[in-house]
């Protein structure tokens, strides 16, 4: 998903869309009748767009960068926090995450509960013993008050872990 529509407190709307030709985010504002009232361009943080999320007080953008050299020191995922006027507040990033291509072959879903943002997305992983770069899920947890990553899961899960088991 590269385009997001969100309702604003005054009944108007804001559309956020990633655009590779504009090298960032296009933000469009619409009145309650969907007449365009303004636009803004927000420069991108990292070159690969993942997702956008709006809370009551802030906007968040998740971006990434390819890491085909399998460099554990390279920032591959970045979560950037903005105020409601699109002024950058801060960001936090994830390195050493078994990722060559963030957001590859899937989507980026984001939700917030309390102080915690959960990002569930995907990636192409480092080359495995069979010589392939497999695709898998990624989960990142961020304390959005401190803008610190508090947990992440980027490794291969045992096949049995991906099934729902029950006794019956």
Locate the predicted segments by residue.
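A short beta-strand motif characteristic of beta-propeller blades
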Residues: 1, 36-42, 88-100, 148-154
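Repeated scaffold domains used in trafficking and secretory/extracellular systems
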Residues: 1-7, 45-55, 100-110, 154-168
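Beta-strand-rich domains and repeat architectures in extracellular enzymes and scaffolds
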Residues: 1-25, 45-46
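Entry beta-strands of beta-propeller and related beta-repeat scaffolds
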Residues: 10-15, 57-62, 115-120
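Short glycine/acidic-enriched loop and turn motifs that connect beta-strands
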Residues: 19-23, 66-71, 124-130
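Beta-propeller blade signature
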Residues: 26-30, 74-86, 132-147
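Blade-loop segments of beta-propeller domains
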Residues: 36-68, 75, 93-98
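Asp-box/WD-like beta-propeller blade repeats and closely related beta-sheet repeat scaffolds
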Residues: 74-77, 88-113, 122-128, 134, ...
